[in-house]
Regions:
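Phosphate-end processing signature that detects enzymes handling 5′-triphosphorylated RNA
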Residues: 35-259
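Bacterial N-terminal signal peptides that target proteins for export
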Residues: 6-20
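Bacterial N-terminal signal peptides
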Residues: 20-28
Length: 259
């Protein structure tokens, strides 16, 4: 059975108070093993939304969920709503790179996630590495399988496409392809390239010194608030889970918080 994941990301810009909002649609075509697959098994479609729609995240979630349900009804798609429709989940999201962003320039990113429970950070860390390119064959050229002794969070090293639409630019679109792999750790590694190369051998082949320190990109972390209000039934065993997420991060003018 295939799965369809619909995600809504609202991302606050680091550099200004003009906050872009990102709606992300992910289509999971199928499953694969822990080995790398050449099949495109995930596609994400992204649209920019107005920040004014989400001054209050929960209100924005509820209003946008109404829109999703209306559109689904108009297209004959059944909506399966969760009993706890707007149960908020909270995480801290951080990205790490070298001082001169050597990983980004090489097409890589390192992401750290820490979960919260009742306002307190839970023990443990989730680390993910993603490699992105504009051509799927180039994305598949990198092997993100973990070193012996580390266990992947998922059984899949996914090839996915990200499609970003620019409605103000003659409706043009930009597509990138990526592979990614994540693992759960009890302790955070030492923040240098070599520590992560010990987990992801591919990072040790970039020509970046193993001693190169890794720091948070832009020096900030994002507070992520997410709800999973339900899923869509497209028929023939095809279901879509809907995630709606707000990221809140500091800006040049101080930290902006959504009430």
């Amino acid at each position: 059975m295939s799965n369809y994941t619909l995600k809504f990301y609202i991302i606050k810009s680091i550099l200004s108070k003009k906050i872009p909002f990102l709606i992300l649609l992910s289509f999971l075509i199928g499953n694969c093993s822990t080995s790398k697959t050449k099949q495109l098994n995930s596609s994400e479609y992204k649209l920019l939304l107005s920040s004014e729609k989400f001054d209050d995240p929960l209100t924005g979630f509820k209003n946008y969920w109404k829109i999703v349900k209306t559109v689904a009804k108009n297209h004959g798609i059944k909506v399966i709503e969760k009993e706890q429709t707007f149960d908020l989940k909270h995480k801290e999201i951080s990205f790490f790179d070298t001082e001169n962003l050597a990983l980004r320039k090489a097409g890589f990113l390192i992401r750290q996630k820490v979960k919260y429970k009742k306002g307190q950070k839970k023990p443990g860390f989730e680390y993910g590495v993603k490699y992105r390119r504009t051509d799927p064959a180039n994305a598949l050229a990198v092997d993100l399988i973990l070193h012996d002794g580390y266990t992947p969070k998922d059984e899949t090293i996914e090839l996915e496409s990200d499609v970003v639409y620019f409605s103000r630019n003659n409706g043009s679109a930009e597509t990138t392809y990526s592979v990614s792999n994540s693992t759960l750790l009890d302790e955070a590694p030492e923040m240098r390239l070599g520590s992560f190369a010990d987990i992801y051998p591919a990072l040790g082949k970039l020509g970046i010194p193993e001693t190169a320190p890794l720091t948070k990109v832009a020096g900030v972390s994002a507070d992520e608030w997410m709800v999973v209000p339900g899923k869509l039934d497209f028929g023939d065993g095809l279901f879509g889970r809907v995630d709606m997420t707000v990221w809140i991060i500091p800006t040049r003018d101080g930290e902006l918080r959504i009430p």
